[in-house]
Amino acid sequence: MIVPDTEGLLIYSYGLMYGSYCMACQMLIPHFQCIPGIFPNFRISTELIKTMTDKLEQPNNNVPQQPWGPFPPAFGGRPSGEQTDGNPGEFDNDAAHQQTAPFMTHFFPRIGLQFPDFTEYQRFNGFQRNAFFPNPFGSQFTGQAFAQSFPLHNSMTTMDGFNLTHAPHPFSTNTNSTKPKDIENTVQSTIKHSSENIQDKPPVLSVEYPVKYDSELKFDANVDFTAVPKQESSDDSTLKNLKKSDQQLQQPQQFTFPPPLLAEKSFEQPRMREDVLPFHPQFYPAPLDMGTNFKQEMRTPPIDGHIDYRKFDASGKRMEFQPPGALHDCQVCLSTHANGLHFGARTCAACAAFFRRTISDDKRYVCKRNQRCNNASRDGTGYRKICRSCRMKRCLEIGMLPENVQHKRNRRDSGSPPRKTPFDTFFNGFYPSFQPSGSAAQPITVSSSESPRHTTN
């Protein structure tokens, strides 16, 4: 039984339950007869039903509340014309000034500010998207009172302006104009030119470096960089450095010889190398009368400051084998990196295996060029340019010892049975008067066709 109310509300019949509440009397338990209640109670129950119904119908009727569906769109800026042009330093949210970022709408739908699109400079300027780099002194100096321009440091695009005075470089890179008078005139004119424009230049730390030309830097590496003292002017220090560099150019270059005693390792006893030519400059004030190659080597010192003595033999003549590296390449083939000491010399694994096979197999080689093979490296096809006879000769010349090679008959994995000591002479070293018990005892003999434990009576 449904009775319409005067106010448009519905009053249900007695006993009808909506959830756990009765529509008529708001009882919490099921019942067959309701107790008539007050009319405002029916109004309360009707309002509760309407509220519950609105919550259930909200996802289907959400046009006035959420026009975007389940997720709000990204902030695209206010429509043009809604806001006036304000201070450019403030956040600009005009739709016409926004930069598009379509991937941010998909991954971050509920975030208004799209973080990866901002640079660090824009973050410190109120997240302004169209922010350009302003005056380095900031926007607080852009008024009418600050119309003049402030002098800045010169741009350090090259190393010429680094930590030096703001003037043209006083030294010319041309090696022909190295006369002291020309350099002094250049320095004086440069100092005069720089003193005229010193008022509009900021103060910087003045550090002078001794200038070395290409011909001087090649052999002189012991000159330290010196800073100009405070009580000394920069022009005086520049002239002193020029005179010092000119004196160093006139002095002959001196280099020291390495000691003839060399050690392969730190824990190895030093020994006299056969391929090192001993030289003592205190006993020979004049150059030795040796080959022209050795004199030419002494006359032109190398860049690294030492002479490779391995290029010369005991007579001072240049050797045919010239290793490119002193201790890193194989001393036999000269083209492979040495991986250690093999039989007393620093060689590669291939040359060590060749030497071991030749000695253990007792091989003999003959050179077809009458021992004139002088290149142990490989050619373009991979074959060696030296024969096996000259290669073996080279192994012996550099100091590989044949007695260090283990022969096949002494190897553990060889096929021949080991040599055994007879039983009656086994204890002779400990007991000289030892005799086996029994006069009929015979010594044990071992043959290759019989078992080692077989005894003959």
Curated annotation (Swiss-Prot):
Main subcellular location: nucleus
Region of interest called Disordered, as start-end residue ranges on this chain: 57-95, 230-252, 435-457
Subunit structure: Heterodimer with a partner that confers DNA binding capacity or a nuclear hormone receptor whose DNA binding it inhibits.
Function: Required for the function of one pair of chemosensory neurons called AWA neurons that are involved in chemotaxis to volatile odorants. Acts in a pathway that specifies olfactory neuronal fate. Regulates the transcription of olfactory signaling molecules such as odr-10 that specify AWA neuron identity and function. Represses the expression in AWA neurons of factors such as str-2 which specify AWC neuron identity.
DNA-binding region: 327-407
Gene expressing this chain: odr-7
Protein species of origin: Caenorhabditis elegans
Assigned protein family: Belongs to the nuclear hormone receptor family. NR0 subfamily.
Protein name, UniProt field: Nuclear hormone receptor family member odr-7
Outcome, altering R356E: Loss of regulation of str-2 expression in AWA and AWC neurons, loss of autoregulation, loss of chemotaxis to diacetyl and pyrazine
Database matches in CDD domains: NR_DBD_HNF4A (cd06960)
